[in-house]
Amino acid sequence: MEFFNTRFWLLASGTLFTVFPTIAALSGSTVADAPAYWASFGSLSDREAAMAAVVELAWGFHILALGLVVLGIGLLATDPLRARLGVIAMVGFAVSQILSAGTAAQFGYGGADAMGAFAIVVIGVPLLTLVTCAVRWNSRTVVKS
């Protein structure tokens, strides 16, 4: 397997985007941790904590939906279409997350604490996927007989 394999990296990113929000939502950690992200307001009322949980769940389900799209691209498309759709999906994902976090920060959103080594995976896999898809933008499908 070559390093710049669009199918592999799209499946890796799609799995990352699908599995982790699902685990966080099902385990209850999304709801339990949500008020801490708005710590700049001090202690939240029950209603405010519920609203914070809804924001976190919606954000997580948005990531999950993008993960399913990325998995679909990885499984159903062939190069160069897969590479081109992969670039669009990865750029779209990055822009949506930057806009979401940036907009929420204007309203006092503090975000998650430092994630340590896990942050390398969360940032590295999509970044490698973007680079791989960009490198393979004009690739040709090789038919072996």
Feature roles, as predicted:
Residues L99-A119, R136:
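Membrane-helix boundary connector in multi-pass membrane proteins
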Residues G86-A104, V122-L128:
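Hydrophobic alpha-helical membrane segments
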Residues T15-G60:
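Hydrophobic transmembrane helix segments
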Residues F17, F61-L71, V125:
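Core segments of transmembrane alpha-helices
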Residues L68-V91:
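Juxtamembrane helix-break-helix junctions at the cytosolic face
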Residues V125-K144:
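Membrane-water interface at the C-terminal end of transmembrane alpha helices
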Residues M1-I23, N138-S139:
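Cytosolic juxtamembrane helix and N-cap/initiation of the first transmembrane helix
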Residues V55-I63, G116-V125:
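Alpha-helical transmembrane segments of polytopic membrane proteins
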